Regions:
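Active-site groove signature of glycoside hydrolases
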Residues: 89-138, 256
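Aromatic- and acid-rich polysaccharide-binding/catalytic face
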Residues: 29-40, 179-210
Length: 256
């Protein structure tokens, strides 16, 4: 059985337009592949790219994101902003007549938290105290989980399938019936139609392939490679995979 491929794309609008301006866009249809498109903005230019993919018969998943100053990814910190972002997305979709195969929620720690953690050597006590406060604040997780679950129900009522893009460590939380990691770093475990585990081996060289072997069997889908674009925090190596590395990861992912 052939795997179903979904290409993640998180590019700023000018580069995005250039990428999808070539005739080769039809090749995505021949592959029966989908595109999960990062919604970095709600511009007319980005809408035109979506329309081009719609016309080519390529299924497009709306990968919802927030502005960097609001955390960029969805987490416990910005749950209240998720509904507003979705409402604005719906208005943009209706105005431009866009078609979506589903909606993706990227669940990761807040950008500011990652930046603080990266500066651990100069603000160690501050970040550790913040983590401790978050670990003991169980109500924060309960409240955010309810907000996101209500949002997911709304999305489904609107006719959308919902994906989450999760760090694989959420699997360990689930197996151990724990919420420690979620409370500590702001992740949240959510019931959705499809969970994609982000096993990006490019961030874990040279041990990346083991990441896929360890968690591949636990995900409905597996994310490999590196999405590029988006927010570059300078925390991890983001050099793209070579073709040899990518083909290796594709073969490993195919096993599951």
């Amino acid at each position: 059985m052939k795997p179903h491929l979904t290409f993640f794309c998180q590019l700023e609008t000018p580069v995005l337009q250039a990428l999808f301006s070539v005739p080769d866009i039809a090749y995505l249809g021949e592959l029966n592949a989908s595109v999960s498109l990062g919604i970095l903005d709600l511009s007319q230019e980005r809408a035109e790219v979506v329309k081009r993919l719609n016309e080519a018969g390529v299924p497009v998943i709306a990968w919802l994101l927030l502005p960097k100053e609001q955390g960029h990814w969805f987490s416990l910190e910005n749950a209240d902003l998720a509904f507003d972002r979705y409402q604005n997305f719906l208005a943009w979709t209706e105005t431009n007549g866009l078609q979506w195969a589903g909606i993706g929620l990227d669940i990761e720690p807040d950008v500011s938290f990652i930046e603080e953690f990266h500066r651990l050597s100069v603000s160690r006590s501050r970040i550790l105290m913040k983590i401790l406060r978050q670990v003991f604040d169980r109500r924060r997780l309960t409240r955010a989980r309810k907000v996101y679950r209500d949002l997911i129900l709304r999305m489904k009522a609107d006719g959308y399938k919902v994906d989450t893009y999760q760090f694989p460590f959420i699997v360990d939380e689930r197996k151990s019936s724990s919420t420690l990691l979620q409370r500590a770093v702001g992740m949240v475990d959510l019931p959705v139609d499809r969970e994609v585990l982000m096993t990006f081996s490019s961030y874990l060289r040279p041990y990346g392939p083991g990441f896929i072997w360890s968690y591949g069997q636990d995900g409905a889908s597996i994310g490999i490679g590196s999405t590029g674009g988006g927010v570059d925090l300078g925390v991890l190596e983001t050099r793209p995979l070579t073709w040899k590395e990518l083909s290796r990861d594709l073969r490993l992912a195919w096993v599951y």
